[in-house]
Amino acid sequence: MFRIVKWLIALPVGIFIFFNAYVYGNIITYRAVAPHRTAFMSMRMKQFEQEGRDVALDYRWVPYNRISVNLKKALIASEDAHFAGHGGFDWGGIQNAIRRNRNSGKVKAGGSTISQQLAKNLFLNESRSYIRKGEEAAITAMMEAVTDKDRIFELYLNSIEWHYGVFGAEAASRYFYQIPAAKLTKQQAAKLTARVPAPLYYADHPKSKRLRNKTNIVLRRMGSAELPESDTD
């Protein structure tokens, strides 16, 4: 009996250690190499296949300096205003999310920063649980410890979902506006950013009033967005 208990404890601990060693190795690799495909992309494409949707993956990596500053400002203004200064976690946002989750009785709000969203996109899935949030936090801490902010943001910009099968700034710019990501205007960047929290909903409801309202909010906030240092030199 004691041996069984030991195995029941050791097995999940071993899996946790192995997974995080795998993740850490990939984080080191991604400091210099673009991901071939993220875990979230694979999960989403499998979901489309199971639903019988004929969706092709459109994922085009471009370097940081070939993405419009307008899009960078729009995303920071909307998703993580303190990105340039925090260590991966917005503690005020996390406390607010915990309160909302406690009131609802479910894990709905996440208080996720750009770094946390990237951790999910690279290595995790769409599930919502405190265990998954804990794993997301561990990955975020590892990534922030060994990766500079520009690279974290570059990885994020290239992995965001924007439509059915459309991932990354370049693919989204080409899909919606037939231009490279480097040429996005403020209005275009704000409208793309407004889609980020619910890209598939807005893919099905492109004339949503909520999308228009969110676009206007992003436009108003863009002027105060603080970018990582290399964009302010």
Swiss-Prot record:
Gene3D superfamilies: Biosynthetic peptidoglycan transglycosylase-like. GO terms for molecular function: pentosyltransferase activity; peptidoglycan glycosyltransferase activity. One of its GO terms (cellular component) is peptidoglycan-based cell wall. It catalyses: [GlcNAc-(1->4)-Mur2Ac(oyl-L-Ala-gamma-D-Glu-L-Lys-D-Ala-D-Ala)](n)-di-trans,octa-cis-undecaprenyl diphosphate + beta-D-GlcNAc-(1->4)-Mur2Ac(oyl-L-Ala-gamma-D-Glu-L-Lys-D-Ala-D-Ala)-di-trans,octa-cis-undecaprenyl diphosphate = [GlcNAc-(1->4)-Mur2Ac(oyl-L-Ala-gamma-D-Glu-L-Lys-D-Ala-D-Ala)](n+1)-di-trans,octa-cis-undecaprenyl diphosphate + di-trans,octa-cis-undecaprenyl diphosphate + H(+). Keywords: Cell inner membrane, Cell membrane, Cell shape, Cell wall biogenesis/degradation, Glycosyltransferase, Membrane, Peptidoglycan synthesis, Transferase, Transmembrane, Transmembrane helix. Pathway: Cell wall biogenesis; peptidoglycan biosynthesis. It is an enzyme of class 2 (transferase). The keyword Nucleotide-binding does not apply. It is found in: Cell inner membrane. Its main location: membrane. PANTHER family: BIOSYNTHETIC PEPTIDOGLYCAN TRANSGLYCOSYLASE, MONOFUNCTIONAL BIOSYNTHETIC PEPTIDOGLYCAN TRANSGLYCOSYLASE. Belongs to the glycosyltransferase 51 family. This is Biosynthetic peptidoglycan transglycosylase. It comes from Neisseria meningitidis serogroup C / serotype 2a (strain ATCC 700532 / DSM 15464 / FAM18).
